[in-house]
C-alpha cells in the first residue's frame, strides 16, 4: 500500500475510534474501500500486462518529416495525437506545394522520395544525392509568408520556408516552381473525420493523407514479397510502426493496441495508390508493382466498396487513445478482445 496509504489509514482509524460505534465501523469500511481502489488502480497496468497476450514486437519506427520525402528511422518516438515525434522532427509537418498552394507528392514528382530532412539541434538539413546540402533554421522566421494549402481537398496553413529552400527543391526536381511550408503548433489542423467518417471529430492531422499512425507487419510484407518478382520494402508503403512476430495480416484484426503506456485504436484499412510503385531508392515510378499484385488478393469486402472503392488494402490506420513513448523492441499487446 505504501507509506502514504498506511498514514491515511492510521488517521481514519483514530477518527473512527473517536466516533460512536456505528459511525466508526462505517468510516473504517469506507476507508478500506477507498484505499483498496487506489491500490488496484496502481497495480492495474502491471496486472493488465500479465493477463494480455503479446501479439508482436516493435521492429521499426519511421518519421516522414516532409510529406512524400525520405523517411527517418528512429529507435524511439513520442506518440502524440498528430503522430510520431522525435525531438524537433514530427511526422508530415512539412509539405511541398505548387504556386496554387496544392500539395505536391511523389504521385506527381517521384524523385521527392530521394530528399531527406534531418535535424541537429536547431538546424534542419535538406539532403539529396549529388546536391549540396541546404541548412535552414528549425524555427521558420515569423516574417515569412503563411500560405493557404490544400491536402486532399482540405485547406490547411503552412509557413513558407524561404526562397533558398524553394529554389533548392525546384532545382533538384527540375520542375515548375515549388515551395516548402511548415505546419506550426498554433495553426488549425486538418480533421480526418471530414475525409472518412470512421474517424472521430476530435482526431487531427497536419499533412498526412488520412491518419496520424499507419501500422504494418513484417509478416504481411513478406507475404506480398513472396508473390513479387522484384521485392519491395516497408518504405514503399511509408508506415510509422512496423511490427514483427505476428501472423500474416494480423494487423487487420487488432482493434486496440498497448505499447508501453501508449494505447492506439484502429480506425480503418489503408487503401493503396500509385505512390506504392515508386522505388524509394531510385525515385522511379513503375506504375504497376506492387499495386497490381495487391489488387489481385487484397480487395475489400463488397459491403465496404463505397469506403475503399477498388483500391487494395495494405496496413491499418490507428489513432491515439493514450500518449507516451514507444521504442524499437517494445512488446505489442492487444486490448479489448
From Swiss-Prot:
Region feature (MOSC N-terminal region): 93-183
UniProt binding sites for Mo-molybdopterin: 67-68, 92, 210-211, 238, 240, 271-273, 317
Effect of residue 165 to A: No effect on binding of the molybdenum cofactor; no significant effect on catalytic efficiency toward benzamidoxime; no significant effect on affinity for benzamidoxime
Biological processes per GO annotation: cellular detoxification of nitrogen compound; detoxification of nitrogen compound; nitrate metabolic process; nitric oxide biosynthetic process
Enzyme Commission number(s): 1.7.-.-
Catalysed conversion reaction: N(omega)-hydroxy-L-arginine + 2 Fe(II)-[cytochrome b5] + 2 H(+) = L-arginine + 2 Fe(III)-[cytochrome b5] + H2O
Record topology, Mitochondrial matrix segments: 2-20
Subcellular compartments: Mitochondrion outer membrane; Membrane
GO molecular-function terms, A-Z: molybdenum ion binding; molybdopterin cofactor binding; nitrate reductase activity; nitrite reductase activity; oxidoreductase activity, acting on other nitrogenous compounds as donors; pyridoxal phosphate binding
Cytoplasmic side: 41-337
Cleaved signal peptide residues: none
Subunit record text: Component of a complex composed of cytochrome b5, NADH-cytochrome b5 reductase and MTARC1.
Function noted in UniProt: Catalyzes the reduction of N-oxygenated molecules, acting as a counterpart of cytochrome P450 and flavin-containing monooxygenases in metabolic cycles. As a component of prodrug-converting system, reduces a multitude of N-hydroxylated prodrugs particularly amidoximes, leading to increased drug bioavailability. May be involved in mitochondrial N(omega)-hydroxy-L-arginine (NOHA) reduction, regulating endogenous nitric oxide levels and biosynthesis.
UniProt protein name: Mitochondrial amidoxime-reducing component 1
Organism in which the protein naturally occurs: Homo sapiens
Amino acid at each position: 500500500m505504501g507509506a502514504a496509504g498506511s498514514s491515511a489509514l492510521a488517521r481514519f482509524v483514530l477518527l473512527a475510534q473517536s466516533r460512536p460505534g456505528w459511525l466508526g465501523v462505517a468510516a473504517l469500511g469506507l476507508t478500506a474501500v477507498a484505499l483498496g481502489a487506489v491500490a488496484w488502480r496502481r497495480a492495474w497496468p502491471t496486472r493488465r500486462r500479465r493477463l494480455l497476450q503479446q501479439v508482436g514486437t516493435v521492429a521499426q519506427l519511421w518519421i516522414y518529416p516532409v510529406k512524400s520525402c525520405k523517411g527517418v528511422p528512429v529507435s524511439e518516438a513520442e506518440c502524440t495525437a498528430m503522430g510520431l515525434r522525435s525531438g524537433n522532427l514530427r511526422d508530415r509537418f512539412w509539405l511541398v506545394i505548387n504556386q496554387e498552394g496544392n500539395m505536391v507528392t511523389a504521385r506527381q514528382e517521384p524523385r521527392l522520395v530521394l530528399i531527406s530532412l534531418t535535424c541537429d539541434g536547431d538546424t534542419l538539413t535538406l539532403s539529396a544525392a549529388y546536391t549540396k546540402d541546404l541548412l535552414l533554421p528549425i524555427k521558420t522566421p515569423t516574417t515569412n509568408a503563411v500560405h493557404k494549402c490544400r491536402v486532399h481537398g482540405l485547406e490547411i496553413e503552412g509557413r513558407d520556408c524561404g526562397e533558398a529552400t524553394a529554389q533548392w527543391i525546384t532545382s533538384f526536381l527540375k520542375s515548375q516552381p515549388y515551395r516548402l511550408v511548415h505546419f506550426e503548433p498554433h495553426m488549425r489542423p486538418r480533421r480526418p473525420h471530414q475525409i472518412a467518417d470512421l474517424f472521430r471529430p476530435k482526431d487531427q492531422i497536419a499533412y498526412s493523407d488520412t491518419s496520424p499512425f499507419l501500422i504494418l507487419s513484417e509478416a504481411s510484407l513478406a507475404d506480398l514479397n513472396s508473390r513479387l518478382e522484384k521485392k519491395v520494402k516497408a518504405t514503399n508503403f511509408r508506415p510509422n510502426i512496423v511490427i514483427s512476430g505476428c501472423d500474416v495480416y494480423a494487423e487487420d484484426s487488432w482493434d486496440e493496441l498497448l505499447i508501453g503506456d501508449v494505447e492506439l485504436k484502429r480506425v480503418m484499412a489503408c487503401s493503396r495508390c500509385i505512390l506504392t510503385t515508386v522505388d524509394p531508392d531510385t525515385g522511379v515510378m513503375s506504375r504497376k508493382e506492387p499495386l497490381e499484385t495487391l489488387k489481385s488478393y487484397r480487395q475489400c469486402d463488397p459491403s465496404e466498396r463505397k469506403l475503399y472503392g477498388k483500391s487494395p488494402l495494405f496496413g491499418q490506420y490507428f489513432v491515439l487513445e493514450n500518449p507516451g513513448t514507444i521504442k524499437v523492441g517494445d512488446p505489442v499487446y492487444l486490448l479489448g478482445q
